[in-house]
Amino acid sequence: MTDLDFIDVADLRREYMKGGLRRHELTEQPLVLFEKWLKQACEARLSDPTAMCVATVDENGQPYQRIVLLKHFDEKGLVFYTNLGSRKASHLEHNQRVSLLFPWYPLERQVCFLGKAEKLSAFEVVKYFHSRPKDSQIAAWASKQSSRISARGVLESKFLELKQKFQHGEVPLPSFWGGYRVTFDSVEFWQGRENRLHDRFIYQKSPEGWSIERLAP
């Protein structure tokens, strides 16, 4: 196999047979249905059911995506944490609009939220930071996220240095570490169906509440 002998992906296909999504199964509030689907993803023992693809856009209009873990959700929004010097945080300084996608492939489902990311309060950040395993807290100090490094050894050496420094007592919260709450105004639920006639429903928020429409696949 040469470097140019790529896999022929055109014929990699299958039917989606896990079920459907009918209007009578929808809930008035999108977060209620999301919680139901998330519970089912957990019960199905999916790997990282809270993993979501977070899409942001830089000042030139170039979109970027990365996988981040959902850490909390309620009627106020969906919460994730990150290094405030990261690429995503830099983008959010210029444009707060984001897209969050939960791809639950084994269940042939996905949920996409559109909304605006706002920084969490210092109280929320401190509370969550100190709930993390100590090594994870130290790792937050060790990594200057999205910066270029010469080798992995540099990162590992820094981690070991900080582990020695913080071996006794509490790890302080880095000033460059925080979180965001995404307040959403659009949520789409997608369920794979046979013959590519997938079920899609979109919730959109207005002053009157949530409207629900079926979309063509």
Swiss-Prot record:
Reactions catalysed, semicolon-separated, are:
pyridoxamine 5'-phosphate + O2 + H2O = pyridoxal 5'-phosphate + H2O2 + NH4(+); pyridoxine 5'-phosphate + O2 = pyridoxal 5'-phosphate + H2O2
Q: How does it assemble?
A: Homodimer.
What NCBIfam families does this protein's entry cite? Answer: pdxH, PRK05679.1
Family assignment from sequence similarity: Belongs to the pyridoxamine 5'-phosphate oxidase family.
Q: Which gene encodes it?
A: pdxH
Species name for this entry?
A: Proteus mirabilis (strain HI4320)
Report the Pfam families cross-referenced here.
PNP_phzG_C, PNPOx_N
Among the GO biological process terms of this entry, one is: pyridoxine biosynthetic process
User: Gene3D superfamilies of this UniProt entry?
Assistant: Electron Transport, Fmn-binding Protein, Chain A
State what protein this is by name.
Pyridoxine/pyridoxamine 5'-phosphate oxidase
Task: Cite the cofactor comment.
Answer: Binds 1 FMN per subunit.
